[in-house]
Curated annotation (Swiss-Prot):
Domain of life, source organism: Bacteria
Enzyme class: transferase
Originating gene: hemC
Organism annotation: Nitrosomonas europaea (strain ATCC 19718 / CIP 103999 / KCTC 2705 / NBRC 14298)
More info: The porphobilinogen subunits are added to the dipyrromethane group.
Reported cofactor(s): dipyrromethane
Cofactor binding note of this UniProt entry: Binds 1 dipyrromethane group covalently.
Record CDD domains: PBP2_EcHMBS_like (cd13646)
Protein name: Porphobilinogen deaminase
Keywords for the protein's UniProt record, in alphabetical order: Porphyrin biosynthesis, Transferase
Assembly mode: Monomer.
Length: 308
């Protein structure tokens, strides 16, 4: 198969999104050195509305709709997303051509004065952007105050440095990609803060009527990561996962066994239903669906109905 002549990559214009797009561009140039590969930077609604939490303005799909429009009208050939921002059902006309190898999937505790959540005194203000993190914090550390925190990585760090928060919780992957890993006070184990579905992985989206482009992206696909992310997304899909639902899902493969952990909680953390399930890596979707059923049977159905 011949190499592509040109590839236009649609990306959000935040520093992290552009890092991710440039990372994919670099990988593609290694594969196709003669190809003209450019980045089309775009500002999305999710980037523009910063004074309201994502759960109240329509969820993370706001970060990718404009990029999909660029694919649809031919301005771009592929779009690069954080998998945790990709809606559980990919719209008709598009396909995820590749899911890249996962960076660190954990959440990171960042503070200038404290080295762990356990050290924070009662009443300390912790900033976070997601209901998932908020519900887990409220459940495990009810003596802390949890407040919304929006904006790009640098904006969030600046708000911490200006004293608005005692600590903030961010995805470790973003900090590491931007060479800000030194800001991490503690990496939170999944037992303390279960990651978001797809956290740490990148997805490459194409038009589904462009089979050549889909084929050209295949070398970037990481099968083990994809198995894990597919299990997480299958669970979330069955639970109606969105920014309005506090849920987490994280799968890992060890010695050819996929272990998926998931939880659903009330936003205030007063109720949390958690479980895990093991299966074959190639059966990730079925493992995810079954874990979702188990969570529903144990009480998640009630929580979801109350949030609907």
């Amino acid at each position: 198969m011949s190499s592509p002549k040109k590839i236009v990559i649609a990306s959000r214009e935040s520093q992290l999104a552009l890092w991710q797009a440039n990372f994919i561009r670099g990988r593609l140039l290694e594969l196709y050195p003669q190809t003209d590969i450019t980045i089309l930077g775009m500002t999305t609604k999710g980037d523009q509305i910063l004074d309201v939490s994502l759960s109240k303005i329509g969820g993370k799909g706001l970060f990718i709709k404009e990029l999909e429009l660029a694919l649809e009208d031919g301005r771009a050939d592929i779009a690069v997303h954080s998998m945790k921002d990709v809606p559980m059902i990919v719209p008709s006309g598009f396909t995820l051509a590749a899911i890249t190898e996962r960076e660190d999937p954990r959440d990171a505790f960042v503070s200038n004065d404290f080295s762990s959540l356990e050290e924070l005194p009662a009443g300390s203000v912790v900033g976070t952007s997601s209901l998932r993190r908020e519900s887990q914090l409220r459940a495990r550390f009810p003596h802390l105050q949890v407040r919304p925190l929006r904006g790009n990585v640098q904006t969030r760090l600046r708000k911490l440095d200006e004293g608005e928060y005692s600590a903030i919780i961010l995805a470790a992957a973003g900090l590491k990609r931007l060479e800000l890993g030194y800001r991490i006070s503690m990496l939170l184990p999944p037992e303390l803060s279960l990651p978001a579905v797809g956290q740490g992985a990148l997805g490459i989206e194409c038009r589904d009527n462009d089979p050549d482009m889909v084929e050209w992206m295949k070398p970037l696909h990481h099968a083990a990561t994809a198995c894990c992310v597919e299990a997480e997304r299958a669970m979330s899909r069955m639970l109606g996962g969105s920014c309005q639902v506090p849920l987490g899902g994280f799968a890992e493969i060890f010695e050819d066994v996929l272990t998926l952990r998931g939880f659903v909680a009330t936003p205030d953390g007063s109720r949390m239903i958690a479980d895990k399930l093991c299966g074959k890596p190639e059966s990730g979707e079925q493992v995810g669906q079954q874990l979702a059923q188990n969570l529903k049977a144990h009480g998640a159905e009630e929580i979801l109905a109350a949030l609907a």
